């Protein structure tokens, strides 16, 4: 947290929190969310990596570096440290501390004896976040999801059949069902297929009705640009 009196209406433009190791360790990095991870060394890092970043200290010690409780604050990425073997934080944009409530996200270091334990310890990240503020959560129904990629009526129904046969709760329509996701002119209140992704046709109301008859839920993705 920032002292409100000392940092009144300030803007944070940079951060260089360092995480240093005693030697040049093996690490696994990706440069984007949902990207593929690749193996490299701390000394060979290039550009900014997304978090979490995993570092192998030795055969019995693995470290994951990341952040939690990210609210109204710039996302942290990790780049090669300016000194020693390690990484340091870099912000993806400026931070208005008044908007952020004079609070920063957690920067965490998770340690485990093997990589699988890092995944098992994911409750650690959950507990660093504020408790749920939604009083009635009965409408939230977690479940497995499969993405529909053809953006056609026929392909969607086939995907729904597969989901129903394999007890998959949801079918997801990702980018492209209402136009090009990065185009601010794309209207998420319409079904307008992005021609770069599919030739269609996609009758989404008909697909949703069919999914309901099969007991399968439908999720639709909307880029934040269409919500502004």
Per-range role (PLM):
Residues 83-85, 138, 186, 193:
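Amphipathic, alpha-helical segments enriched in basic
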Residues 7-9, 94-98, 134, 156-159, ...:
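Short, flexible coil/linker segments at or flanking structured domains
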Residues 99-170, 174:
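An acidic-aromatic substrate-binding cleft motif
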Residues 86-94, 126-146, 197-207:
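Short, charge-rich amphipathic segments
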Residues 146-228:
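Aromatic-lined carbohydrate-binding/catalytic grooves of carbohydrate-active enzymes
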């Amino acid at each position: 947290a920032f002292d409100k009196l000392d940092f009144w209406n300030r803007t944070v433009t940079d951060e260089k929190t360092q995480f240093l190791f005693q030697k040049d360790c093996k690490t696994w990095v990706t440069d984007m969310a949902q990207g593929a991870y690749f193996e490299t060394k701390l000394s060979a890092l290039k550009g900014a990596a997304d978090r979490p970043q995993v570092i192998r200290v030795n055969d019995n010690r693995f470290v994951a570096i990341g952040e939690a409780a990210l609210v109204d604050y710039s996302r942290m990425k990790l780049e090669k440290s300016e000194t020693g073997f390690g990484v340091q934080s870099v912000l993806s944009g400026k931070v208005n501390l008044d908007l952020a409530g004079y609070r920063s996200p957690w920067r965490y270091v998770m340690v485990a004896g093997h990589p699988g334990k890092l995944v098992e310890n994911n409750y650690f990240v959950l507990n660093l976040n504020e408790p749920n503020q939604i009083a009635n959560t009965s409408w939230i129904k977690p479940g497995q999801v499969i993405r529909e990629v053809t953006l056609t009526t026929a392909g969607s129904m086939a995907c729904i059949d597969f989901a129903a046969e394999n007890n998959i709760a949801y079918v997801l329509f990702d980018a492209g069902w209402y136009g090009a996701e990065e185009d601010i002119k794309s209207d998420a209140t319409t079904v307008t297929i992005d021609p770069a992704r599919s030739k269609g046709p996609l009758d989404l109301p008909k697909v949703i009705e069919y999914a309901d008859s099969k007991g399968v839920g439908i999720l639709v993705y909307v880029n934040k640009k269409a919500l502004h």
